[in-house]
């Protein structure tokens, strides 16, 4: 899967699952603020990404995933 295709799929999935406008999910936007995530919702997001893309996001890596660009790069390099 090409990176742009992966990003489009991820944006669509996250927007639908967390009821956020796709336009709000910009590469440099803060994930927690944009999606209004608390710690439980963050766990849900990680599980969803793991399931949809077959990439395990490791707990120690979570603090480094601040923006959607960080998340895209993390997932794409591990696919």
Predicted region positions:
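Conserved ATP-binding motifs of the histidine kinase catalytic
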Residues: 38
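Two-component histidine kinase catalytic core, primarily the HATPase_c
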Residues: 41
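Phosphopantetheine-dependent thiolation modules in NRPS/PKS and related acyl-activating systems
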Residues: 2-35, 45-46, 51-79
